[in-house]
Structures are given as structure tokens and as C-alpha cells.
Amino acid sequence: MTQNTFKVALATKNGAYFLTPDEGRKKWEKSKPFLTEENINKVVSDGHGNFFAASLTEGVFRSIDGGKSWKPANKGLHVRKVWEVAANPHEPGTIYAGTQYGHLFKSANSGDSWEEVVSLHDAPNRENWGIDWGFRTTGLALHTIRFDLNDPKKIYLVASGNGTYRSDDGGETWKSLKNGVNSACPLGEKGVSSAKPDSPPDEKRHKHLEEVHSCTHKIVVSPKDGRVYQQNHCGVYFSDNHGDQWKDVSINLENRFGFPVDVIEGDAPHVFVIPVPDPIYDCPDHNVCIQGQLSVYRTSDWGKSWSKLTNGLPGGVHTNVLRDSFAHDNSDHPGVYFGTTTGDAYFSDDLGESWKNIATGLGRIQGVNVVG
């Protein structure tokens, strides 16, 4: 991928935008908004000329002309609140969609039609799916689908409140991946651990924290070696055996909670997270709120140490960065991107050492992806 062959797609509550860089990624051109009547969670490309948009209002939309025009692509998709759409890199034309209520759909013809992956109904503990989220969150959503570039049979998925699952046979069977994940969120400290059952509201939150330890907010699979990285409701985890066992490498008790995670492979794996220290739940436009300094954290030594990266990022914010709102390109010098629920997009060309605002005033950004 060269610097002038991609665009950054920003999905928002009211449509989506493309940001196109110049050759040096010094200037960015913002497109007119598209799909403006839809609540868009994510825009992706399949590498073969097709773009797909996951809509929380009307299912999947497809473009076959580089995003200039869009049409619904929902035949067979019987749940239209779509959180995730992902192209299988091993099978051109094969697209997956994750929806509300924990359903997984597959298209073998680039979105012309869909069939439900019914094997997921037999996944371990499936009968207990359906955790009732409090604190203004989303309910049961199949929000993440990931592939292992080194193994065409491995597929990962995440359903909110129910942890990470993996298939080793292309989706025929599924395995729950919870070994090593804390049995409960840490309690009694700052951040997610600040709940104490001193009053009825706090008692409810205390119970909530004890139950959501298995809630994976996002995973990413290394394209180099298949290692898996997880941002959990209660911590950051690494796995070097495809999720069979997790290691807690959280920054500290104050910064365990967050939504996105990403990895850029180089001389070392550079892993990025954006914590929400001491999250504030009374902010419905943002799920929960980052208040104060907006900070990105990076580790390049498997979580032994973390660098706090704030150069170019604002302080005094009241915002959030959602699970799908962090991405990178595959240039020789990778660009890193993220968007906030207050409508700002940021870019770094030095692995997060410094940041530049490349878009503002877009409304609630829900997804950031590199397409092309």
C-alpha cells in the first residue's frame, strides 16, 4: 500500500466521510458525507474494488465504484442492526457481518446474498448469551470479526459481554477463549475498580463489574505471527497461542478500561490502546467519558512498559474513542489514526510520538478504517 492509494474512512452516527492524503500525508482532503441518513458503524474494503458499510439502521450497504455510490446489500440478512462487516482475506468475495443479538452472517458472493452461520448457536455457553448491559451501553452485539493471515481456517469473533471465540475449521465449530482472563474486575481502586457497594446505585455497579470480566471490547490479530491482543472491560491481555491462554499486561489499575486496541508489526510489535481512566458513565453520547488529557499508550516490549503519548493531543476533553475508531495503514512508515465521539480525527506518522488533527466537527465518530 502506497501513500496515495488509500483513504481513511470515518464512520459516524450520521453518515461517513473519506479522508484522502497527498503523497506525503501532509494535507488531507475530506469528501462530502455519504449515507447521511444512516447510522454507520464501520466502512471497509475487500481489496477487490468493493466497499462495505455496516449500518446500525438499515443493514449493509455496498459500493462497487470506490465509494461514489451506495446500495443496500441485505438479501438474507434478517437482522439489520449491523455492527461489524469484514472481508475474509483468504477467500475473495467472502464477507462476514456481525449483528445485534449475537448473529453472524456470511456472504460468498460479495454481499449479493447472506446466510446465517448457524454453527455459532452451538458455541460454548451460547445459551447464556444476552447479558443485559447497564450504564447506557449497547446490549448484545457481535461487534468484532478477525482472521489469522497465517491460517485460513482460523476465525475470531467477539460478542459483547461474552468474551472472545475462535474457530479452527472455518466456522464449523467454536471455542471460548477465557483462560487467564481475570475472574472479576479489580475492585477498590480508581477507574473500573472504584465501585463500592455503599448505596443502591453503587451496589448495582459493583455487581456489574463482577460480571463483565469476560467482556472483550476489541481484539486484533498480528499479521506477522498470529499473536492476539485484547482490550478487555477490565484490562489489556496478550496471547501467544491464539487465545488459548491470556496474559494480563494492563498498564496499571487506573488505566485498565478502554475500547480499541491495534498492533503495528516492525522491529517489534507496537501495540496501542486508549484507556479511559476513572470512566464517567453519565455521558450517553460517548458511552463513557475520558475527562482531562486525551492519551494514547503504546508498548513495544509485550507490555513490560508502556509509553504515554500526548504530544499534539488536547487536554481538558470530555470525549471517548470507541472500539472501531483506531486504525493504521500499511505504508513503509505506517500512519496511525483514531477518531473521537466529539468528531475529531487524529493522525501520527511516527508511531504515536506526535499527533495532528486532520478532521474536526464530524459528530460522533464510531469507526476509523483504512480502505483502498
Predicted segments, located by residue:
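Extracellular glycan-interacting surfaces
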Residues: 1-372
